[in-house]
């Protein structure tokens, strides 16, 4: 395949056109008075969104060189989304401002490599200022404010705050479709996994079709149980203790299953058998989680334990185990709190070290189950289009809220970046030559988000920004919704520190890469051939 090449200034200008196309489409959504963008879908109804990364991903340009610039901006948005879950539009606006300012300097003869060094140093200085301005979340109201701003909706903010308050920092919160028009939150207490009873004969509540075991012993094994003789000794010990028994095993079948059912029907021993959750190594880890939560031991030949040898001390215990047809919930596991804490710390370390999204998701799920909380936000709306948009906003707000819990919050509305500008300008003056130019372009770009927020509200930025800077108070800013100067924290106009920091760092990274680009290489577009003419028959 033949390639096309572009060099020097031509290359950079083509990239800039691509950057501007994406950034101009994205930046109109910034702030509480930002507009929406309608995205055409090849199937189903169109999507209406104000989420920067969703809009950026949909844009594909015909010109191959401009498309390269567009891809770089998409990278800014998606990287910020991956790290912080929000701030994609802010990152895009910052990147565009840095690139436009940087290209002017490169065209005027500045050395891009030295400029890049200046950009990196100035970004570190700005991040330091952002961290200094950060404060920890102090209340449920703070969480609600962060979520409300990200979702642009107070009701969603309160629902997320309620969910996070119940499940805690390590709990899992998922978003599903509601069967009604209402948006609400459902909680699952304790550890839940998606395996139910092996036989309906174990049911104790025929109305709900559930087996409910109060203060049971829990036998946990990775083996298949089919011979009754292997479990008779432990069944006798549990029956003598006068408590019910829950068996979690790879499978329970044959005479072992019929003995358990028969004992249950005769009233000799209340019991229920459940298949172990997960598969392979994941199953082993989940069984260990259950064992640690309940204070039991996983009966496995790997550690030299057989079913015949176990004592009642090897069994786990809980306040309540509720088993339905398709899921099981263990409430109030009686494991050692220190052992549970150690297991949680171990899973957290694994989450930090894994690069696989799927692996991360399953580990977070296990973490939540051990921490004892799963919340499901049921999103309701009148139409499919509105539902899609609402779910998207809830997911974004959840990510932003987690980021806020992790690193704290700063004044929102672009004010924190604006206030970092002065320190970065002073720092730039300590540098020299083209490094200084690189640092200065970072300083100049720091007011781009606040300007865009004010413009999107139909107001003039210059006067408002001047008045904000006049007052030397990091909490002081402008509420574009109410059109007045306020204490940003008291008014609930706050952003997660992680979001603001990530947006700036990712924008600076992409701007540096683009400014140091000299050559573009792209594939030549294929010529589309028209349909061939059918052969005409010979004329005689």
From Swiss-Prot:
EC number: 5.6.1.7
Catalytic activity: ATP + H2O + a folded polypeptide = ADP + phosphate + an unfolded polypeptide
GO cellular component: cytoplasm
InterPro entries the UniProt entry points to: Chaperonin_Cpn60_CS, Cpn60/GroEL, Cpn60/GroEL/TCP-1, GroEL-like_apical_dom_sf, GROEL-like_equatorial_sf, TCP-1-like_intermed_sf
GO BP, one annotated term: protein refolding
Chief subcellular location: cytoplasm
Keywords: ATP-binding, Chaperone, Cytoplasm, Isomerase, Nucleotide-binding
Lineage: superkingdom: Bacteria
GO MF assignments: ATP binding; ATP-dependent protein folding chaperone; isomerase activity; unfolded protein binding
One Pfam family cited in the UniProt record for this chain: Cpn60_TCP1
Binding site for ATP: 29-32, 86-90, 413, 479-481, 495
Record's keyword annotation contains Chaperone: yes
Top EC category: isomerase
Localization in the cell: Cytoplasm
Function per UniProt: Together with its co-chaperonin GroES, plays an essential role in assisting protein folding. The GroEL-GroES system forms a nano-cage that allows encapsulation of the non-native substrate proteins and provides a physical environment optimized to promote and accelerate protein folding.
Recorded family membership: Belongs to the chaperonin (HSP60) family.
Assembly notes: Forms a cylinder of 14 subunits composed of two heptameric rings stacked back-to-back. Interacts with the co-chaperonin GroES.
Full protein name: Chaperonin GroEL
Source species of the chain: Petrotoga mobilis (strain DSM 10674 / SJ95)
Name of the encoding gene: groEL
């Amino acid at each position: 395949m033949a390639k096309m090449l572009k060099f020097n200034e031509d290359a950079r200008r083509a990239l800039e056109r691509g950057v501007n196309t994406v950034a101009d489409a994205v930046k109109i959504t910034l702030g509480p008075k930002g507009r929406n963008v309608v995205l055409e879908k090849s199937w189903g109804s169109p999507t209406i969104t104000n989420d920067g990364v969703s809009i950026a991903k949909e844009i594909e340009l015909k010109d191959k060189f401009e498309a390269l610039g567009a891809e770089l901006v998409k990278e800014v948005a998606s990287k910020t989304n991956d790290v912080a879950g929000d701030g994609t539009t802010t990152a895009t606006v910052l990147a565009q401002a840095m690139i436009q300012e940087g290209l002017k300097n490169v065209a005027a003869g500045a050395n891009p490599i030295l400029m890049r060094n200046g950009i990196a140093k100035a970004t570190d200085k700005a991040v330091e200022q952002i961290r200094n301005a950060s404060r920890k979340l102090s209340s449920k109201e703070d969480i609600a404010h962060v979520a409300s701003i990200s979702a642009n909706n107070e009701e969603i903010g309160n629902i997320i705050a309620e969910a996070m308050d119940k499940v805690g920092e390590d709990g899992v919160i998922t978003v599903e479709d509601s069967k009604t028009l209402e948006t609400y939150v459902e909680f699952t207490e304790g550890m839940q996994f998606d395996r139910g009873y092996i036989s309906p004969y174990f049911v104790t509540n025929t109305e709900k079709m559930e087996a409910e075991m109060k203060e049971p012993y829990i036998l946990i094994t990775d083996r298949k149980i089919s011979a009754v003789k292997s479990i008779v000794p432990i069944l006798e010990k549990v029956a003598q203790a006068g408590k019910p028994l829950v068996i979690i095993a790879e499978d329970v079948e044959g005479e072992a299953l019929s003995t358990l059912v028969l004992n249950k029907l005769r009233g000799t021993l209340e019991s229920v058998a459940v298949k172990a959750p997960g598969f392979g190594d994941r199953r082993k880890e989940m069984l260990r989680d259950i064992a640690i939560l309940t204070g039991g031991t996983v009966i496995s030949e790997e550690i030299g334990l057989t079913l015949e040898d176990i004592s009642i001390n090897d069994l786990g215990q809980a306040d309540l185990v509720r088993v339905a047809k398709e899921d099981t919930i263990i409430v109030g596991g009686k494991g050692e709190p220190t052992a549970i804490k150690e297991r949680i710390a171990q899973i957290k370390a694994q989450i930090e070290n894994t690069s696989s999204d799927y692996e991360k998701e399953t580990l977070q799920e296990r973490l939540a189950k051990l921490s004892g909380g799963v919340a499901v936000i049921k999103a309701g709306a009148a139409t499919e289009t509105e539902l899609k948009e609402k779910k998207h906003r809830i997911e974004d707000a959840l990510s932003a809220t987690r980021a806020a819990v992790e690193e704290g919050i700063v004044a929102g509305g672009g004010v924190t970046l604006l206030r970092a500008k002065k320190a970065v300008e002073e720092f730039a003056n300590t540098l020299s030559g083209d490094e200084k130019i690189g640092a200065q372009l970072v300083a100049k770009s720091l007011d781009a988000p606040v300007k865009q927020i004010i413009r999107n509200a139909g107001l003039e930025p210059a006067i408002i920004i001047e008045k904000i800077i006049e007052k030397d108070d990091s909490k002081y800013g402008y509420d574009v919704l109410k059109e007045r100067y306020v204490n940003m924290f008291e008014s609930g106009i706050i952003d997660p520190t992680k979001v603001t920091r990530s947006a700036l760092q990712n924008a600076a990274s992409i701007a540096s890469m683009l400014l140091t680009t000299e050559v573009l290489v792209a594939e030549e577009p294929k010529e589309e051939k028209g349909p061939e003419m059918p052969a005409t028959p010979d004329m005689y």
